[in-house]
Amino acid sequence: VLSMGACGTDSDKKASTQQGTQETASEVFDGPHSAQMKLDLSKLVTKLADYKGIDVTISGNYDVTDDQVEQNLMSLLSYYGITGVEVKDRDTVQKNDYVKVDYTGYLDGDAFDGGSATDTMIDVANNCDATQKTNYIDGFSDGLVGAKVGEEVSSDVTFPENYQSSDLAGKKTTFKFKIKGIYKPVTMDTLTDDMVADAFTEQKITTKKDLVAYVRQVLEKQAANSKSQASISAVEDDLLDKCKVTIPDEYLDARLQEYQHEFEADNCNDTQTLEQYAKNNNTTVDDMKKQWKELMIKQIKIEFIFGRIAEKENITISDDDFKSFVDYLVSSGNSQMADENAVYKYYGGGNKEDGKKTLRQLYVVNQAISYVVEKANITVEPDTQTTESSEN
């Protein structure tokens, strides 16, 4: 729920040369460490509102429908290459067919680079790739209707004047197709257990029924996570509005310095300063710092409020639970948190003990948030916009 990086987005994994720069930066951070500052939350949280059984409202659609399952299942089938069922009672292509072809494009009689493919499934009616749903040049599939399996047919195509390749822009070309099979779009009725078993071997899904159950389980998990996050945000906002918190200036300054250090380690290197990063993202360092401060104040208030609740409710953390939490961070794929010590250094600005203390505090805060959410009276209002858009 909370993290030291709450003021910004996670960066992509860096190249190995950048990792070295980042690790060095973490080691040399010598600013005041917020983890070393003594905080008396009973004095800093000057007003702690009632937090048991609070009433909050969230909006959204968290029930998974059969239509959603079918739509997502069809997208999954397309991703795994299951796009059509072969038609065997006729051999002539019709407008609404999918057609498997090999094709080659010719410019002035010579095959051109990037103009050929094998075993491509074409959606004739929509003039697009049946699997990727990417559109072809106008007229590309016009010559396929009426062709027979085993035949070779041609289509004359003129590329647009603004086509990305200057060699082809505005040029007249010819595409030759070999018709290899006729297919109908796969549907829930035509999907078979054998098709599922062949495509989902690694997942050990062998039947259509199992695939439907798998997709529903994934969607229900996503919906539950979305509902949980919405509930957490609503509870946090409610208590932020009702509680009063004082943040010591030196503590806020330390947190902002720590965050900037972490941000620069993630996003800056020998070839990109913070100023250059800001310029590349159409902003300024001053504007970035203003945003960081605004978000950090909210972050700290949440930590103080729920930290105080944890004190009042005697919420603590066991060593086993904390180890599981750290192991989860290690497995997250962040190159800067490859092992337990690296995690502590990452959250402690190079200081393992500070990082360990900070993480334990954050974990307890998260437990307190869960405690309040579990006791809250949460009303769900359907998101009418989402419902209407899904029906259209």
Language-model segment annotations:
Residues 2-6:
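C-terminal motif of bacterial Sec signal peptides marking the signal peptidase cleavage site
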Residues 7-392:
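FKBP-type peptidyl-prolyl cis-trans isomerases
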